[in-house]
Amino acid sequence: MRSVSDSVFRLLTVAIVLAALFLIPPELTAETDTPKPESEGLVTVHDADKAYQGLTLYPVTGKPEVHLLNMHGKILNRWHVDADRARLLPNGNLLVIHGSAWGRNEEPWENMREMIREYDWEGELVWEYKASEIVHHDLQRLPNGNTLFLLRHIIPVDEIDRETLDEKRREADIRSDSVVEIDMDGQIQWEWHLHDAADFNYCGKRSCDYLLRGDDMIREFDNWTHVNSVQLVPENKWYDAGDERFKPGNLIIMPRNWWTVIIVDRDSKKIVWEYQGDYRGGISGGHEPHMIQKGLPGEGNILIFDNGFQVHRGESFILEINPVSLEREWTYDVGKQFFSRTRGSMQRLPNGNTLISEDNTGRVFEITPDEEIVWEYKGELETSRAGRYDYDYCPQCLAFAE
């Protein structure tokens, strides 16, 4: 026989459960999405006195998210989009190419690889452009408001004089690349086609033999260039001294499969400068070559992320090159402690440090000129060319100044 106290206890228990169902905020119930954590990676090193303070844009490769992080790894803003490349704009919007190494096989992103999109701070779409082919690897909003990007260009077999190519290379279309500049109305203002500037038999330092071997053998197309970076030449001391090759507005381009960095004259559209390197066998792959801007330590030099997968066998490094003498001014090489088989980037910071995005591992770290790691963030997944922004870069960023 149940006692009165037992009955009262049971009634109280039921009342508490019912109250909980009505009082617990709906965002915490199982029927709704679980709240997103404030951080999904880990800051393992942070020397506040030596690190350059700012915000880090961290595109996640492995799920549709781009994070804006503070120096402690806290996620300050989150865009729910896949990004092969993402750039924060001065108005707080995000300029994006979809189709990352993960997203190119996931809906809806795999069907959006011809798109360039701009999202506002809240993640709402505010502008888009659909290209004629796949947009890939790199883009940027120019000071004049136009957008510069890389475009895949497939050249059909019947449009090429195949007698000038190796017999095995006459069996497939050739993949080349173009650089395109459009205005906000989507009108093309300038374009450059690599196949108009170079002979099909030229493959840079690597030579064209790789196209005929093993896994690199021609499949649906001859992957001739595989450009992965395009950057404008900024104002610089070399041009000020009269060297026309480094005229501001010229383009620094990385045809990855050539293992060669080139500069293209914007007016003549000719290749006016090349660098293949000689350090430890020369460039092997390579990403993100760009000239350090005026006012930053090393101004005028060119930084290159050398992946090192094939020539250097699993060891990446950063090169800082004097583009006139072609001498190395600085090298970051720590053997197998630093390696990203694909992708990757680096950025010279105002205090002289260098931010490095080791994309394949999801690690982003900042080093001093003496190679001391003074900030390090390890994400749960891979990333795609993370970058640091000043607190005053955009109006929304100011709220997070420390």
Where are these regions (language model features)?
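Membrane-proximal basic amphipathic "stem/tether" segments
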Residues: S7-V8, P25-E31
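Bacterial N-terminal signal peptides that target proteins for export
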Residues: R2-T13
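Histidine-/acidic-rich catalytic cores in large beta-rich domains
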Residues: L28-E402
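Bacterial N-terminal signal peptides
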Residues: L12-L23
